[in-house]
Amino acid sequence: MTPLKIAIAGANGRMGRVLVEAVNNHPDTVLSGALEHSGSEALGLDAGYAVGLKTGIAISDDVDTVLAQSDVLIDFTRPEPTLKHLQKCVEKQVNIIIGTTGFDDAGKAAIRAAAEKTGIVFAANFSVGVNLTFHILDTVALVLNEGYDIEIIEGHHRHKVDAPSGTALRMGEVIAGALGRDLKQCAVYGREGHTGPRDPSTIGFATVRAGDIVGDHTALFATDGERVEITHKASSRMTFAAGAVRAAVWVNGKTGLYDMQDVLGLNNR
């Protein structure tokens, strides 16, 4: 079997470094390119320098050259560069795995449009455990659909720039969908001052940013006399990276827009 050629965007970032390691660890993949922004101090360095690997792949800012020698790009950067990379992937017929969060509606529309021409796995979280949690939440919300207040609490490291996290928002979307609600209409993001009694139709969000928290997410269903808490805690970014590489192998040869539920076969259950 010919190894799948995978390039990493943001290869010198916290997530990018772990992705380089994950590609190296997978028996069916090989690192074909590593991208960083122009002016990065890492340009020219071996892509594995930060994790003790010698990959033979130099970090570059030449997107066209990197994509020309790749089957898939994995991108966990920020919305603006991800959308630029997306258009290049369409031009080069390269599949793309998108773990970037914080897209606005226009950005999401661009991803949907691009999926008509290439294969895309776009997910708020690539952890197997988190995606199983989404699946569980759908069932729980259907059962606890009356008389329960719903809150989502998430925590991440001090460097995360968007809030709530994409994973927290996806949890909210799953719950709202199960309840027949529109998250845009029922979400409450933070509370301050005299807020009055809680509206029972709302889904609340609370955010923590501190230290080096990799990712903590809890969905709370509370009523008089009891509460149900469904929690996922990540202790290593490798869980996200390994999932992204798994998605890259899965989407090879496909066209269309998928998420991690598709990769894991959970959308068929």
Swiss-Prot record:
Annotated NAD(+) binding sites: G10, A11, N12, G13, R14, M15, E36, G99, T100, T101, A123, A124, N125, F126
Encoding gene (name): dapB
Active site: H156, K160
Cellular compartment(s): Cytoplasm
Binding residues for (S)-2,3,4,5-tetrahydrodipicolinate: H157, G166, T167
Function: Catalyzes the conversion of 4-hydroxy-tetrahydrodipicolinate (HTPA) to tetrahydrodipicolinate.
PANTHER family in the record: 4-HYDROXY-TETRAHYDRODIPICOLINATE REDUCTASE 1, CHLOROPLASTIC-RELATED (PTHR20836:SF0), DIHYDRODIPICOLINATE REDUCTASE (PTHR20836)
InterPro entries: DapB_C, DapB_N, DapB_N_CS, DHDPR_bac, NAD(P)-bd_dom_sf
Family: Belongs to the DapB family.
Gene Ontology biological process terms, A to Z: diaminopimelate biosynthetic process; lysine biosynthetic process via diaminopimelate
Principal localisation: cytoplasm
Matches recorded under SUPFAM superfamilies: Glyceraldehyde-3-phosphate dehydrogenase-like, C-terminal domain, NAD(P)-binding Rossmann-fold domains
NCBIfam families tied to this protein: dapB
EC number: 1.17.1.8
UniProt name for this protein: 4-hydroxy-tetrahydrodipicolinate reductase
One Pfam match: DapB_C
GO cellular component terms attached to this protein's record: cytosol
Originating species: Neisseria meningitidis serogroup A / serotype 4A (strain DSM 15465 / Z2491)
HAMAP family (alphabetical): DapB (MF_00102)
